[in-house]
Amino acid sequence: MRKALAKTYIYELIFLCIYLIVTNKLLEIFEEKFILGVFIILIINVVVFFYLIIYLIILLRSQYYVYKLNLSKSIVMEKKLYKMKKINIMKDIHRINLSAYYRLLNKEEEALRYLNEVRISRFTLPVVRYCYYMNLAEYKYYNGKKEEARKIFDENIKKESNKNLLEIFLDYEDNPEQKVVELEKILPKQKKRLYKLQVENALAITYEEIGNFEKAMEFYKQVAEKESEIYFIKVAKEKVLELSLKNKKI
């Protein structure tokens, strides 16, 4: 992910340089009518500036709703950002985000629709390529197509020193004890609230799988205490009740 982001930043710097070169060329073209040239460039810059400000405000609102675990409102914001992008290839990051949010709400049909609209080409930004294949692999994994998920991950995603959630699931599918070790290792490193909850939920499921119901209950409770329409949070609430009833019977 870090390498993909670094490459994307480099591409953005290249685009900025191209923009500056074009601006300079426009000034040369309008050299004899300098005031007209400056006026045209000023108008272009003002339009771009206000476009970026509006885009940034909507983007921040979208991220705020993700932090608040209100994905329905975040989806509304993402759709606005999606409509603002006029170039099809620039819409892909919003298609990926929409797909991920719909999947977390257990709306598989919508999730797959947006993911299928993404077109990967040699012009695709590295961070978009990374996010697409990660989301595609996750979709395959959680729909029971684990071999396909493994193949997508191995062929398209470079392994990093810090394993992500999907990589841990794929590597330790048949070794829940080691899966717990790896999940516990990455949990303190999580900065994003939603991803941290996903790791806690994975720990709850894995602890339940190995029969450590006390630890499973501990993590299920941490997830279940959040108020959200996210599907795994709803399931965690049900699991807390289920394990509580089991404990009473014992």
Which residue ranges define each predicted feature?
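Alpha-helical repeat scaffolds
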Residues: 73-81, 108-120, 145-157, 177-191, ...
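Juxtamembrane interface helix immediately N-terminal to a transmembrane segment
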Residues: 1-14
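Long, non-transmembrane cytosolic or organellar matrix-exposed soluble domains/tails
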Residues: 187-250
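Transmembrane alpha-helices and immediately adjacent membrane-cytoplasm interface residues
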Residues: 37-67
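Alpha-helical segment of the N-proximal tetratricopeptide repeat
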Residues: 56-87, 93-105, 120
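Alpha-helical adaptor scaffolds
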Residues: 100-106, 129-138, 142-143, 151-192, ...
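Structural signature of alpha-solenoid helical repeat scaffolds
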Residues: 49-50, 82, 86, 123-126, ...
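"A position-specific structural signal for the A-helix of alpha-solenoid helical repeats
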Residues: 60, 90-97, 128-135, 162-170, ...
